[in-house]
Curated annotation (Swiss-Prot):
Its main location: nucleus. GO terms for biological process: chromatin looping; meiotic DNA double-strand break formation; mitotic sister chromatid cohesion; negative regulation of chromosome condensation; negative regulation of maintenance of mitotic sister chromatid cohesion. GO terms for cellular component: nucleus. The gene is RAD61. The lineage of its organism: Eukaryota, Fungi, Dikarya, Ascomycota, Saccharomycotina. Involved in resistance to ionizing radiation. It comes from the Eukaryota. Keywords: Nucleus. This is Protein RAD61.
Amino acid sequence: MRAYGKRGPVLRTPFRSNKGLPSSSDVEFSDDDVNSVIPDVSSTISSSIADHPIEGLLDEPRKAQDSSSSFDGANEKPSSQLDSKRNDQNVKIITSSDTSMAFMKDEKLSAFNFLDGSKASKRKRRRTYQKHDANITSSIEPDVQDEDSITMHNEFESIRKIYNDINEFILKLPRADDDILNKMLENEMKMDDSIENNSIRTSKDKKYGKFRTILINKNKENEIMGEEVDQKANTLSLNNADNSNAEKEGLTSTNHYNELKNMGDTIKYQDDIEFLLSNSKSNDNTTVPINEYFKKLLNLSLMIINDEEFFQYAKRYFKKEIIKLSFAQFRSDFPELILLQGYLLHKVSESQSDFPPSFDNFSIELSKDDGKIRTKKNKHIKKLSHLNFEDFLRKTQFKTGLYYSLSLWEMHGNLSLDIIKRISILASNKDLFSRHVKTFIPLLEKLITASEFCHMYIEQPEMFDSLISNLNNQFKDMLDDDSLIKILILLTNMEVHNYTLWKEADMIFQSSMNTILESIHPLTDAKVDNILLHLGLCLNICSRENSRLKLDGKLWYDMKTIFVKMIRDGSDTENRLVQGLFYLNFSFLIKQRKENSNLDPGELNLLLVELEAFKSETSQFNEGISNKIEIALNYLKSIYTSERITI
């Protein structure tokens, strides 16, 4: 057992003489000393016990207890190891008289002879320290008690002063009426309700964008999910009213958590899009090489194609950045790059305001890509990028730059004269028009009435003839396309005479009228708009001055059959406009056939009655139709009068 300084263990002896002995605190042991002392003491004790019977030592047990307690000195406990040894032996050694102590005095002191001369003087550590502490404590305790009493007295006086001030303030307050208290309570209740409603409303209106992040503990997340499950289980056992309230509370409590989950699903794309949009310039602020720029746009395009959620996120939050990156560089001799730029602009732009300033020149260059220029291998594209570009073409179904340019022009509001000229050239090309007819038709519908468009075709009639020929070639295959029928109606309304347009008039009228006869009686709601457009186109053709339509007998017979059915079945008020336009077309065909109409006076009279009613209805909103009805009525009245005279 080791001993370290004054705090180390000290060997205690149970013997005590009446004379002053060195205190236990004055004795220190090293490791070797302790090991040598313990056997000597134990041998001495055993020899003394053998000479003197143990009964003699136990005559006065109470005195022995008092002496052992006084031996402890200044609150010292005996050594635990010696006590444990004595307990194991079940032997208690107690001094009972001065004779026994005198007998063992020499024996005890002889055990400490080896300590003589080890040091000239010993430092009194523990005893002196304890006495010093006791003296200091005895001298300081009265002062501390005085200071504590003064502090407590001051605090008590300050508290009493505050208490008196509050009592004085309360006593000075006027007595309040019950009405005032009731109003105050009502206002507080209303305020609580408004705060609760506002908190519910704001919790539902919380918005999360790309710049807001909220941390949530995993344990809290599990608690929320557990609460949701418990909430659903509890609502099943309640009545209908309680169920509705519980559902509202559940929706309110989980609204914030669900918004966090949705925000996490979208923020996961932020690093990807920021990486793709970064490094558009090199470290020295110069433009990156064209092949690296092409690779960056290609990777961004493939990401948009492969991941729809990524595309929606990029379009919502990074639309301007994508357009800016797409037009950071432009090379007219790099058609593959122009195609990628057109694709990205077509995907993310929503209106004309999203287009770059150089849109006119760019779109014209983009329209030159008809798919043939990509047969040559570009020197700017590396092998891996070339393979990725072929993958891009396959996934976009090999759409050309012409397709993207036509789509962008349709979105554009006011087209420049250069773009209109470019559209006219493209539309007059038979091969290009047939391949992109679905894209050309909506664009031509918007341009056909433009003054620049009309003047250009007047100056270049051969281009106008090519356009009309392309429209006629596609007409039979696009009878259900409302935009194509509108274009032909607008062209037939023009006063400019064009031989190419009217030489196909018989074919157009025949195809349109057959479509009308198939659906007009009975007429479904889905077909109303298309049938009205076909009736208007046929009316423009058959009502034209000096019109000489060559129709077969079957078409005339079918028209007469439908006319008779409609007359006998009565007027359908819901489709009055459709019936009136059909009667008007039928009247102009009677005028062209003249003696071959084969109508009896009764049917002719009914036709006159229907046209008169139709004229009164249309005169208020369409002057052109009203004038044509007047022409048809004059002719039919002359026929009806002559037939009555003949009869």
